[in-house]
Amino acid sequence: MGKHIVPRSVLLFITLSMVWTLRPTSAGDGGDDESRIQRGFDIAPVLLDLKGKNRALVGLGSYIVNAQGGCNDCHTNPPYQNGGDPFLGQPKKINVDHYLAGGMQFGPGVTSRNLTPDATGLPAGLTFDQFLNVLHTGNDPENPGELLQVMPWPVYGNMVDRDIRAIYEYLRAIPSAQPGP
């Protein structure tokens, strides 16, 4: 059998192809913050007030709240508009009139909190440090010494502060709303 000689140009091509395949993720391929930020803006169900806000954190916060956190399911009452409940096989339509305004009952004495900005612009009426404390510890800001029930704060407590900051910044950007019926 004859020798197979591979031209250097082919070897170079193969080597570069392997290096390209092993490269770290980059913008636009779904593995970076930029694509999550853009997706967050794409899926935000309400108009956002970006004035004076960190745009990147707002977009990332929207992504976490709307694509990962499922916050709407408990903090919007009802979560979906009539005819828009995906759990009933209907095309999803978020209840934007009461979006994240709380009011969902989970038994006696347990009602989801309004996360929208209060009159001073603070989400749920909390400063960032208070919000961070709630998500890390589960301490109920309205009832000191008590832990939040139903809210999955033990899971959110594992998040890095930057992601919690992004959630907070997104909540600052959504419109204020009142709880549903």
Q: Locations of the language-model features?
A:
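Bacterial N-terminal signal peptides
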Residues: 10-19
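Electron-transfer interface patches adjacent to heme c in soluble/periplasmic c-type cytochromes
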Residues: 90-134, 154-164
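Sequence/structural segment immediately N-terminal to covalent heme-attachment motifs in c-type
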Residues: 54-79, 84-99
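Bacterial N-terminal signal peptides that target proteins for export
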Residues: 2-10
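Bacterial Sec-dependent signal peptides at the C-terminal "C-region" and cleavage site
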Residues: 20-30
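Electrostatic cytochrome c docking/interface patches
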Residues: 36-66
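A cross-kingdom feature marking solvent-exposed beta-strand/loop segments within repeated
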Residues: 143-155
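C-type cytochrome heme c attachment motif
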Residues: 63-76, 130-136, 165-169
